[in-house]
Amino acid sequence: MNCFDLTVPGDPLSKARPRVYNGHGITDRRTRNAENRVYSEFRRKYGDMEPIKGDVRIRLKFWMASRHPRDWDNLAKLATDALNGVAYQDDVQIVEAQVSKVLPDRRVPGSKPGTMRNRKTGDPLLFMGEPYEPHTEIHISEIINPTN
């Protein structure tokens, strides 16, 4: 069974809607750069490994740099589109997905021992009191169907 585990450093980005100019859809530079970061990280780790040909299960976990609201489906869309043709032939093969977002704690330790205060810009990122750096965790596995 083919299985890929990937960690992409940096703040996860949502896939932006393409802008239409003269009847043509144009993907913005920020989205292209973010997709390229996912693609490049996959190629760096797995080289020219053959993409999965069968059904795919994917698990995505987005460790966010802020509590700014982002739709989970647009976060997932960027990652799954970036892996088309490298991890799997096409994202239509994805038949099972689990997506989660990890947001930084609203409250952080205060200056006095045992106290808490509201998180401010520039505070370390904490989840349940544990520090982290923004990144995306991706787990992809082929679903083996014994009847095929």
Go through the PLM ranges and name each one.
Residues 1-148:
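Acidic, proline/glycine-enriched N-terminal capping motif
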